Curated annotation (Swiss-Prot):
Its EC number is 2.5.1.48. GO terms for molecular function: cystathionine gamma-synthase activity; pyridoxal phosphate binding. It comes from Schizosaccharomyces pombe (strain 972 / ATCC 24843). This is Probable cystathionine gamma-synthase. Transmembrane segments: none annotated. It catalyses: O-succinyl-L-homoserine + L-cysteine = L,L-cystathionine + succinate + H(+). It is an enzyme of class 2 (transferase). Coiled coil: none annotated. GO terms for cellular component: cytosol; nucleus.
């Protein structure tokens, strides 16, 4: 069995272990039983204290926690003598200000209680104080990090912004900040020792060779130097093994250009980032005239793409109008539409009957700013009637934003029917479950194109950390091929589940009542995607199936390996009745099918159902 196959078919099983196993920047966590999922939601220490990783918008990673601990000890922070204060970390001043504004708008908090601190500037100040001429620290690059400090009693409100927007710093950015800090500290100690040696030399040159303090300092400096060299060799080795090259700004810039071209559908073949990039080719995937990589914008997460799309639309359209969430979209999408702007109308079922209701609302004179939907939706895999929605948008003047994460542009073509398409690159585009990212694609044929494009030129910040971009580029090179394998495997499993008497409902685009709407956008060689959900006749069967199935079990989707979760428990534990009213059974099990050998997967599901 090859190493790759072994990695796919031997999932981690220990509560709290990372998914993938032993991965520094893993974005999922093992919750192997139904009980452990409930325990996580209820804060059971038997679960929470064992968590080595978690989904990054819900779980503060160890690297980020370490950054927070260090920044709290910076002189500029310590001098404030703050008591009972917490902080979140962001990659730009603009995002930090947005976080502060959200805090002040949602809680009874005085603006003076919210402090924005440039942690990068603070670390540079320390660097300059020890090595002003940069003799020893010339090559140290400190990534941009801002901290937003606030009284601990407002932690819940502050976390809402961090979670919903997805604009917190990534674990790789945090790790780089920590590495810079440790390097500067080591150099600082080295220079102190060097000055001590110089002082001792000047005081007693004749006793230099035998002075015990001086000998100790020389020994310390030698050890520190060797340790520093070893650390740098380890880092270089890691980068060479992981990327086959050293990371630098020029490669990151090239990687981001490749990503944008790949997402625009104008780059089919792999490229060498160290060589000149080929000119942008013609469309081979997207079917929108005039589309180029200049219409693609990258973000640190998928939710950041959605949040910023909504933010830009509020600036260029009529912000006094509400938005529409059509269909049961991912929880944070709805929260963004509800908590920013003028609110939203929620059509949770997202079916033709609710589209009739929406049309009647428009006919009555109600005006809306934008309609947000997923194609298909998560976790019910329903497909809205995009053709009809486009006609309504043209008639009643509102923007259409489609999240294509689940369908992905290998399988479906939704951009011609949308003004903006967003996606989480964290999912199948990456596949490796070790990096976050998001994208926004503008439709050049949209009536709002010029306004949105001008606003993006003025306000867009590239906050996708360079190393994250390099990781995404590497992971996504075989995106199209992986999608086809996963399409095949998912259909194979659905054919198996569809015939099983224990299954009450199978949710999959091929079998859903909204199939005709999916087919209207499906590419000629496209499949139905890798995500499916099942509801059992007997809730106990759902729990037994989840506990027994031998696949990775935790949050997220779109992974190269099969990943299962009791979706309603994880995403809506505090609002299960409300979720049920919108079609989400509390015992629903969601499965993201991976690239394991088909026969292996069939046996895994047969055993879990037996």
């Amino acid at each position: 069995m090859s190493a790759n196959i072994s990695y796919l078919v031997n999932p981690p099983t220990e509560v709290g272990s990372s998914i993938p196993a032993d991965t520094e920047h893993a974005i999922s966590v093992t919750l192997p039983t139904w009980k452990s999922n409930v325990g996580y939601e209820e804060g059971d220490p038997n679960v929470t204290t064992k968590m080595k990783s978690g989904y990054p918008r819900f779980f503060i990673s160890a690297h980020v926690k370490d950054c927070i601990s260090i920044i709290k000890k910076f002189p500029e922070i310590e001098i404030l003598k703050l008591k009972d204060y917490d902080m979140f970390l962001y990659p730009s001043l603009s995002v930090a200000k947005q976080s502060a504004a959200f805090l002040e708008s949602k809680g009874p908090i005085d603006s003076a209680e919210v402090i924005i601190y440039d942690a990068t500037k603070g670390l540079r100040k320390h660097l300059d104080s020890i090595d002003r001429n940069r003799k020893y620290t010339e090559e140290i690059h400190i990534p941009q990090v801002y901290s937003v400090l606030f009284p601990s009693k407002y932690f819940g409100i502050a976390k809402q912004f961090w979670q919903h927007t997805g604009d917190g710093i990534s674990s790789r950015r945090a790790a780089a900040f920590l590495h810079s800090y440790k390097k500067i500290q080591s150099i600082s100690e080295f220079l102190v020792a060097q000055r001590s040696i110089s002082h001792l030399k000047s005081k007693s040159r004749s006793r230099y060779a035998s002075h015990p303090d001086l000998q100790a300092l020389n020994t310390w400096m030698t050890n520190e130097g060797n340790q520093a060299n070893d650390e740098m060799e380890d880092v270089s080795l890691y980068l060479e093994e992981r990327y086959g090259r050293n990371l630098d700004l020029s490669l990151a810039t090239a990687a981001k250009l490749v990503l944008r071209r790949r997402i625009a559908g104008t780059l089919k073949d792999e490229v060498d980032l160290q060589k000149a990039l080929p000119k942008e080719g013609s469309q081979y995937l997207r079917e929108v005239k005039g589309l180029s990589h200049d219409d693609v914008f990258l973000f640190p997460t998928g939710m950041s793409a959605i949040y910023n799309t909504h933010r830009i639309l509020r600036l260029v359209l009529d912000d006094s109008r509400k938005s529409v969430c059509f269909g049961f979209c991912y929880v944070d999408t709805l929260k963004i539409l509800q908590k920013w702007g003028s609110g939203c109308y929620f059509y949770g079922l997202g079916n033709d009957e609710q589209l009739d209701e929406f049309e009647k609302r428009l006919e009555s004179g109600e005006k809306v700013m934008a309609l947000f939907c997923e194609f298909p939706s998560n976790p019910l895999l329903n497909s809205p009637d995009l053709v009809r929605i486009r006609k309504l948008a043209d008639s009643y003047d509102f923007a259409v934003v489609v999240d294509e994460t689940i369908g992905n542009f290998v399988n479906v073509e939704v951009l011609p029917l949308a003004d903006v398409v967003v996606s989480s690159l964290t999912k199948i585009f990456s596949g490796d479950s070790n990096v976050m990212g998001g994208s926004m694609v503008l439709n050049p044929s949209s009536r709002y194109y010029s306004r949105i494009k001008d606003a993006m030129k003025a306000l867009y910040e590239d906050l996708l950390y360079d190393e994250d971009a390099l990781t995404l580029e590497r992971n996504s090179r075989d995106f199209a091929e992986r999608s086809q394998v996963i399409n095949h495997n998912a259909e194979t499993i659905c054919n198996l589940l569809y015939q099983n008497p224990k299954i009450k409902t199978l949710y999959y685009p091929k079998y859903n009542t909204s199939k005709e709407h999916f087919e209207a956008c499906r590419r000629e060689n496209g499949g139905y995607g890798g995500l499916l959900s099942v509801v059992f006749h007997n809730p106990e069967d759902a729990r037994q199936f989840y506990d027994k199935i031998q696949v990775a079990k935790g949050p997220s989707l779109g992974t190269n390996f099969t990943l299962a979760s009791p979706y309603a428990i994880l995403a809506h534990y505090q609002e299960l009745d409300w979720a049920g009213e919108n079609g989400i059974d509390r015992n629903l099990v969601r499965v993201s099918v991976g690239m394991e050998p088909s026969e292996h997967l069939k046996n895994v599901f047969i055993n879990a159902l037996s």
